[in-house]
């Protein structure tokens, strides 16, 4: 009898493992969203891809707080980037807490992420009142979250969409669905009028009109040009589109044509398109049939339009296959061009050990009931998916609850074309960023030594050997204020010999040293200065220079540095700022906070300088907690990676267009003027392989001699590449008009109206820096630190150069 039972047990196990599913699987890699950011293993529709390719997930921590978590697809690391209560300066608990990020996380062209918070659920005995949801932005460029206020008192926020070009944002509240308008310039909320359907979202079409669905499923349209709202019924197949029940919650997105909205309801698997540009009193809609057949369809914020135009949805249906029980979550696809529906398969988890469902204590973790195992041993979601997005490369991400999971689906990822010159160059920079991060202990050691010398009265400065790093580190937004031998915090005449003995000289090389550089180094040493050098040990002509220096940061570039594809100036700048970051961190570990520069582009930038420059060595009014070793350098590297990724992800088509135009100009025998501005440009523009096509003329709007130089030297009607900073000043704009220049503009945003003329130039590449430049915030200090602009500009310019030279071969 015992042997028979053993046989049947073996038979059951064997047949289970041999069982074949009657459907295909779509495999995904599961990642448990940071557990400290949610209370019930739950989240909602809050999911997006940033310009930097990172994934941003909103969470829900009922009765406590809400967070946005950044997920890095390359490393699979996660970190909190928005703490709702922290950014809004709240400490409420219970029903009064900001318990959810429910919004879909809108990403503007700038890369800023727009979101909003929502209330949770009132528990028995909780008498607290919910104040209303907060409109919150997160800017990956400078790792900064902002609170823009409560749009409607006692109402949460269900949706936020920004129209950055017009300075507007559209907000849908909940639990009553008010449609709100936010004016960024006026910093004011106003109500647009019609009440909307539950969990309505706003689409902004190609003409700038905003659309949403009213409570009775009419199309509400706001035209910012006329500031009027219209309502029209939607007609599908000769019948009015109506909301049949409370579960008819729409998810829609806008196609690339700028006027077609694709929509699915939570409880209906039918796919609908709506022509937002419809003329007349009715809006035209088309029912394209069922995405999936099955009982009790359920699709939750799970319609996304991929870059190739295909529409993907997640729909769960009752499992009636006889193969397991519960629900099955199908990934479906519709090709609008071929008018073809596909059931791609049932979601399945590649790595079922991503969460400890069966801990050693034998107790099943709470809120871990959202997955089950099918007869063939495959783990699949049981209850609810909550969001779906397609990224630039067609990777799909879904969120699943219980436990709260980010599921990465790469089965439909598009293989990118072979990397071109610019991509190869940018990726070589990333390799150096990784190497620098591995070498952080050296930077920390150098930073601690620098901070100690500074504390003892030493000055840190440059002797101007003609390298980019000398210009890059001095007088920059978010940089040390008193760096430079001519920039002490007290009268130089009052310095003691002991203080002078602590002086530290920074020297650097972008290329081969000049004939007298070694002799000058020896003179610095003889004067008693500690000499820190930056350069490539691979360059044999720097061997003696490296030996002469007291310390050396190896840039680890090729002996002659790739040209085209020059790296020394970029890698040197990154290394210099990481050294400065670790120097500042070392100060904080001693309870000190040195004075730092605030950008003069900011309204109060000069006032800030007047308060501290040449006057204050350490702040007395700002208290900064000790920053761990390596943390600040790593944070800066994280921001540089983010901005370089954004540049590659969003600006390469424009960069290629620029390269085409400049190469054509060069082949016609005409030079291109680079009207450059910035700290490093004079040492690299027109100096190396780019001299084949570029003539550098420095043009800073506040230097009259440079404006006159451009007037004299730039050809009338010539092609001009403006390598700028933030926006375009009126003086430089007038200069281009005077010379009738054909301008290719490389610059970043500037909210000041007097610097907004860059919007008038159709050929514009966005360098992607946030206004104010500095990109690393630290707790307790009112301004961000360390500017990325010099690095990003140099990287963008050399990326353009390698593309131009490739075309000139």
Protein language model annotation of sequence segments:
Residues 115-132, 314-329:
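Short, conserved, GDST-rich strand-edge loop motifs in beta-rich repeat architectures
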Residues 49-52, 107-110, 162-166, 205-207, ...:
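Residue-level detector of Asp-centered blade-edge/turn motifs that repeat once per structural unit
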Residues 376-417:
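Blade-level signature of beta-propeller repeat domains, shared across WD40, Kelch, NHL, RCC1
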Residues 77-110, 118:
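Blade-loop segments of beta-propeller domains
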Residues 449, 455-588, 667-670, 676-806:
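Glycine-rich phosphate-binding loops that contact phosphosugars or nucleotide phosphates
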Residues 33-66:
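Beta-strand-rich domains and repeat architectures in extracellular enzymes and scaffolds
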Residues 31-36, 82-97, 149-156, 196, ...:
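Surface-exposed loop and turn segments in beta-propeller and other repeat-based domains
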């Amino acid at each position: 009898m015992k042997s028979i039972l053993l046989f049947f047990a073996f038979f059951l196990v064997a047949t289970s493992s041999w069982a074949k599913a009657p459907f295909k699987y779509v495999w995904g890699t599961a990642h448990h969203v940071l557990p400290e950011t949610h209370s019930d293993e739950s989240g909602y529709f809050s999911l997006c891809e940033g310009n930097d390719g990172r994934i941003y997930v909103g969470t829900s921590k009922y009765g406590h707080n809400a967070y946005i978590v950044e997920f890095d697809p390359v490393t699979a690391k996660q970190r909190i980037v928005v703490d709702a209560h922290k950014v809004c300066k709240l400490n409420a608990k219970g029903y009064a807490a900001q318990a959810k990020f429910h919004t879909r996380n809108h990403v503007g062209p700038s890369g800023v992420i727009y979101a909003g918070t929502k209330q949770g659920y009132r528990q028995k005995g909780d008498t607290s009142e919910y104040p209303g949801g907060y409109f919150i932005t997160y800017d990956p460029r400078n790792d900064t979250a902002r609170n823009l206020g409560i749009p409607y008192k006692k109402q949460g926020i269900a949706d936020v969409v920004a129209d950055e070009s017009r300075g507007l944002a559209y907000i849908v509240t909940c639990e009553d669905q008010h449609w709100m308008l936010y004016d960024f310039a006026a910093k004011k909320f106003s109500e647009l009028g019609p009440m909307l359907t539950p969990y309505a979202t706003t689409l902004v079409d190609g003409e700038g009109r905003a659309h949403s669905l009213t409570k009775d499923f009419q199309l509400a349209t706001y035209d910012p040009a006329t500031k009027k709202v219209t309502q029209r019924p939607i007609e599908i197949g000769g019948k009015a589109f109506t909301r049949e029940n409370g579960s008819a919650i729409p998810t829609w997105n806008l196609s690339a044509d700028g006027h077609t909205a694709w929509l699915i309801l939570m409880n209906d698997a039918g796919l609908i398109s709506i022509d937002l540009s419809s003329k007349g009193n009715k809006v035209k809609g088309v029912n394209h049939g069922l995405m999936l057949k099955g009982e009790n369809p359920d699709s939750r914020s799970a319609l996304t339009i991929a870059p190739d135009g295909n529409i993907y949805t997640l729909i769960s249906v009752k499992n009636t296959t006889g193969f397991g029980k519960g629900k099955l979550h199908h990934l479906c696809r519709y090709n609008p061009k071929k008018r073809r529906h596909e059931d791609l398969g049932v979601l399945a988890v590649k790595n079922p050990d991503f969460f400890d469902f069966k801990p050693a204590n034998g107790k099943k973790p709470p809120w871990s009931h959202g997955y089950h195992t099918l007869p063939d041993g495959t783990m699949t979601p049981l209850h609810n998916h909550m969001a779906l997005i397609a990224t630039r490369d067609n990777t799909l991400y879904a969120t699943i609850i219980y436990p709260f999971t980010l599921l990465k689906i790469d089965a439909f990822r598009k293989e990118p074309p072979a990397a071109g010159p610019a991509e190869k160059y940018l990726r070589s920079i990333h390799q150096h960023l990784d190497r620098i991060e591995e070498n952080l202990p050296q930077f920390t050691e150098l930073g601690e030594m620098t901070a100690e010398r500074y504390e003892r009265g030493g000055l840190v400065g440059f002797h101007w050997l003609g390298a980019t790093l000398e210009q890059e580190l001095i007088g920059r937004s978010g940089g040390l204020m008193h760096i430079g031998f001519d920039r002490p915090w007290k009268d130089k005449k009052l310095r003691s010999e002991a203080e002078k003995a602590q002086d530290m000289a920074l020297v650097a090389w972008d290329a081969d040293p000049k004939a007298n550089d070694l002799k000058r180094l020896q003179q610095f040493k003889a004067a008693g200065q500690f000499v820190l050098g930056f350069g490539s040990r691979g360059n044999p002509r720097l061997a003696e220079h490296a030996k002469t220096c007291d310390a050396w940061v190896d840039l680890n570039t090729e002996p002659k540095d790739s040209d085209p594809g020059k790296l020394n100036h970029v890698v040197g700048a990154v290394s210099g700022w990481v050294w400065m970051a670790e120097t500042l961190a070392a100060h904080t570990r001693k309870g000190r906070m040195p004075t730092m520069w605030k950008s003069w582009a900011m309204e109060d930038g000069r006032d800030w300088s007047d308060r501290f420059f040449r006057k204050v060595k350490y702040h007395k009014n700002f208290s900064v907690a000790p920053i761990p070793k390596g943390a600040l350098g790593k944070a800066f590297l994280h921001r540089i990676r983010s901005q370089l990724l954004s540049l590659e992800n969003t600006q390469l088509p424009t960069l290629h267009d620029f390269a085409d135009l400049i190469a054509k100009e060069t082949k016609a025998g005409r030079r291109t003027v680079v009207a450059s501005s910035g700290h490093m440009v004079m040492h690299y523009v027109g100096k190396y392989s780019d001299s084949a096509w570029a003539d550098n003329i420095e043009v800073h709007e506040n230097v009259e001699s440079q404006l006159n130089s451009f007037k004299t030297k730039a050809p009338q009607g010539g092609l001009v590449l403006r390598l700028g900073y933030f926006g375009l000043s009126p003086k430089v704009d007038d200069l281009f008009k005077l010379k009738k220049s054909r301008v290719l503009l490389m610059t970043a945003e500037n909210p000041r109206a007097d610097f907004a003329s860059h919007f008038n130039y159709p050929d514009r590449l966005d360098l992607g820096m946030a206004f104010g430049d500095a990109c690393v915030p630290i707790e307790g200090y009112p301004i961000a630190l360390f500017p990325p602009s010099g690095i990003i500009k140099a990287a963008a310019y050399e990326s353009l150069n390698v593309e131009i030279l490739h075309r000139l071969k």
